[in-house]
């Protein structure tokens, strides 16, 4: 059990038979009446976001999540197949379960899979990934006086804005949280 006073961004709670992650929270102490905590919760299963208000000090069940490191081995139709490198068990996840992170997922990549009651609910990618640029416009010297950017498609199909000097075949480092270019990789 966790008190609503202890809510922080990223806290996971169990409510109405689902796992919810606290996206935003605000402790409110009105001049008249008792204090309360206003929250925005995101469902780990469906991705829905709801606003919910808790009384200050209200006890809520905390969700017990298990985190395991799995390797993405291959695609089978629309499913992503992952393997536990210790037990060699395979786990299949749909694109919806993986979410937006699937655009950076490539075979052989290790990710953390978060499970609740033995059901995978979320995939955590590394903070940065190194991918090869497969498609981009050629950058011509003297195009701009200051640093400009152009769109580039990487090997997984994701589109990232990169500096003008990046060309096809180069490996670049991308921040998976902000979808931004971090630098070249050799």
UniProtKB/Swiss-Prot annotation:
One of its GO terms (molecular function) is translation elongation factor activity. The keyword Nucleotidyltransferase does not apply. GO terms for cellular component: cytoplasm. InterPro entries: Elong-fact-P_C (IPR015365), NA-bd_OB-fold (IPR012340), Rib_uL2_dom2 (IPR014722), Transl_elong_fac_P/YeiP (IPR020599), Transl_elong_KOW-like (IPR013185), Transl_elong_P/YeiP_cen (IPR001059), Transl_elong_P/YeiP_CS (IPR013852), Transl_elongation_fac_P (IPR011768). GO terms for biological process: peptide biosynthetic process. Pathway: Protein biosynthesis; polypeptide chain elongation. Involved in peptide bond synthesis. Stimulates efficient translation and peptide-bond synthesis on native or reconstituted 70S ribosomes in vitro. Probably functions indirectly by altering the affinity of the ribosome for aminoacyl-tRNA, thus increasing their reactivity as acceptors for peptidyl transferase. This is Elongation factor P. It comes from Synechococcus sp. (strain RCC307).
């Amino acid at each position: 059990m966790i008190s609503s006073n202890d809510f922080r961004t990223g806290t996971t709670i169990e409510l109405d038979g689902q796992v919810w992650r606290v996206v935003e929270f605000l402790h409110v102490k009105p001049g008249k009446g008792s204090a309360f905590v206003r929250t925005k919760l995101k469902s780990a299963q469906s991705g829905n976001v709801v606003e919910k208000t808790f009384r200050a000090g209200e006890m809520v069940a905390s969700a017990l999540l298990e985190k395991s490191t799995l390797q993405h081995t291959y695609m089978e139709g629309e499913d992503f197949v992952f393997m536990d490198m210790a037990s060699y068990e395979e786990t299949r996840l749909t694109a919806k379960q993986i979410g937006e992170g699937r655009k950076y997922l490539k075979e052989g990549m290790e990710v953390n899979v978060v499970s609740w009651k033995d059901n995978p609910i979320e995939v955590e990618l590394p903070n940065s990934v190194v991918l090869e640029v497969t498609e981009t416009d050629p950058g011509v010297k003297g195009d701009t006086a200051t640093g400009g950017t152009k769109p580039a498609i990487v090997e997984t199909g994701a589109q990232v804005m990169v500096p003008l000097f990046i060309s096809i075949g180069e490996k670049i480092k991308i921040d998976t949280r902000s979808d931004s270019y971090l630098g070249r990789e050799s």
